[in-house]
Amino acid sequence: MVEVITRDDLRAEIDKGSVTVVDALPAAPFASRHLPTAVNVTKEDSDDRVAEMLPDRAAPIVVYSTDSNCDRGPGLAERLDAGGYTDVRLYRDGIQDWADAGLPLDRSS
């Protein structure tokens, strides 16, 4: 089972640079806005793409999607956990919670 992380804990880890943040949404929503430092990987991506984007299976990873009603984040987090990634957590409240708190978002150029 994947552990859930809070917004405040995730923000602290992003600030320290101690976590790989993974946006589980499709490419278009990711391009329009995403959490700082996030990479885009979806549950539909091939195993090769996942391995390319997340090569270190022991690295701390936090996965998020839209909000607690979206199944993309939990689905990807469970896939990573089952695939041998050893430190996967889920930011269940997602990008909507982050944005509602007024925290910074990035966009792809």
Can you say where each PLM-predicted feature lies in the sequence?
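Rhodanese-like catalytic fold shared by cysteine-dependent sulfurtransferases
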Residues: 1-20, 24-63, 67-109
